[in-house]
Amino acid sequence: MSDWSINDARTGYNVNYWSQGLYGISDTGEVTVSPDPSHPEYSIGLNELAKDMVKSGVALPVLIRFPQILHHRVNSVCQAFNQAIQKYEYQSDYLLVYPIKVNQQQTVVEEILASQVSKEVPQLGLEAGSKPELMAVLAMAQKASSVIICNGYKDVEYIRLALIGEKLGHKVYIVLEKLSELKIILEEAEKLGVTPRLGCRVRLAFQGKGKWQASGGEKSKFGLSASQVLTVIDSLKQSQMLDSLQLLHFHLGSQIANIRDIRQGVSEAGRFYCELQKLGANVKCFDVGGGLAVDYDGTRSQSSSSMNYGLTEYANNIVSVLTDLCNEYKEPMPRIISESGRFLTAHHAVLITDVIGTEAYKPEVIEEPETEAPQLLHNMWQSWSEVSGRADQRALIEIYHDCQSDLSEVHSLFALGQLSLSERAWAEQVNLRVCHELRDVMSPKYRFHRPIIDELNEKLADKFFVNFSLFQSLPDAWGIDQVFPIMPLSGLDKAPERRAVMLDITCDSDGTIDQYVDGQGIETTIPVPTWSAESPYLIGFFLVGAYQEILGDMHNLFGDTNSAVVRLDDDGRTNIESVLAGDTVADVLRYVNLDAVSFMRTYEELVNKHIQEAERANILEELQLGLKGYTYLEDFS
């Protein structure tokens, strides 16, 4: 297609929308990142960046982090709420809290905290949902506001550690997830001589919609019902500790796509807040939890991988609803807190890797079957003759269904021993040739052609064997059908000639990506340039900075990938910082309690027994290097 342009590529991969301006396609067809939005004139070509890393000894796949994106996301959220507070004359302030469960990597947490270093009054706190996370935030929270929110189920040790946090100078809010926690908190606080800051997670009747909707609603795993909240109030009054209840928390679920759901949830929780104030509580903080979505597919819709609102609209809705409620009840306006971890981290990381090979259909010359061949084969030849002779548009559909039916019968007859292997192979090739021709002559402008075109694209798609583990690097794509943007990193200045599916290198048929961003929709295949060993290109998986690393597992013992931090300086120069090596074979063996040292001793015994002396040293060296090597394939150079 000679009229192909870069704008066609940008539209086809929808990059202008899901990337939020952080990623793009250059005029030469290469994917770029602009990690510092304060300097949009500076960008980095991801293809060259990855190749430079490989030359310096960093094997693919590699996860690349852009910390300046983290800084930008933090400041964007704070700015949106600050502007909303000013717009609606809200009489309090805003605090952004990062739940470290989203990505606990030290680099990520420290860069998020660093985004507030220059602020006179930091607007950033940290959230922990377990004892290990609490131990981490106790050591890091002082770099921002020193506010810590403790969620999740708690035992005595967790509660004592949280209370000790107050002694260390932090402002620690212990959120009640169940009634039994209150008694323990009050007892341990008295022992330690600490006045606790309590929060209460309320279980709303309203439930948002999405993949994580079970986090909200009356059947939620966490939170207190209305009657349980009243029990907490009564218990605190009896203990003369009602002033300790300082935070109200609710959570609709992660990735809330519809702004109406957010508005309705805030409205119900706001009523809880106002009623608690009427009962004598002194709640100072209103924590809306998570839910601020990421537009993974760029469709700006209510799909589970998108969002039908922007950051400004999100902040405006929360602030305006609370303003109206507090004015209605004549209650003081609380500090607004949100826990927007996914929004902060998703965009900052991209996984780059190589294609190790492809399997592509190429039309073959097919001979007409012999006269004595089974009638079924002649029927299939007739279908091929009709489609190659350009049958009319409606006949094309009939030809397609006839050919699929005939192929199914061929397989049945082969299983019964009534067709030979060569006859089956011939039939399969004819079927592929018919499908290939149909895809070329059918048109999406005919509504009744569209579902068949989708089927044909999937049936004829190239298989790309990609050097990564879906289970390790994109577990949500496997586990919950999460959509992630995927693009070739180069060659996008020319019209894509193929459609493909991406398969990982695990020995599992589930290691296949089933959904791809394609224009303003989701398809089961992705348009790509022709790939060959002589002209290979790299693949980028985008928006993988939230949850994927910590949720990833070691299926087939593929471990953590190499990673690197990349930053632009003020002059637009690219600096590759803190390269972190991925897991070695010995590392992953150790995770499953297999001892590489004892394996080496066994290898030595086997080598001495079976290998001639002249070869022993070389064989042992290769075995040792195998244990020290990367768990992924290392042929790309």
From Swiss-Prot:
Co-factor(s): Mg(2+); pyridoxal 5'-phosphate
Residues carrying N6-(pyridoxal phosphate)lysine: K101
Alphabetically ordered keywords of this record: Decarboxylase, Lyase, Magnesium, Metal-binding, Polyamine biosynthesis, Pyridoxal phosphate, Spermidine biosynthesis
InterPro entries linked to this entry: Ala_racemase/Decarboxylase_C, Arg_decarb_HB, Arg_decarbox_C, Arg_decrbxlase, De-COase2_N, Orn/DAP/Arg_de-COase, PLP-binding_barrel
Superkingdom assignment: Bacteria
This enzyme's EC code(s): 4.1.1.19
Function: Catalyzes the biosynthesis of agmatine from arginine.
Official protein name in the record: Biosynthetic arginine decarboxylase
Name of encoding gene: speA
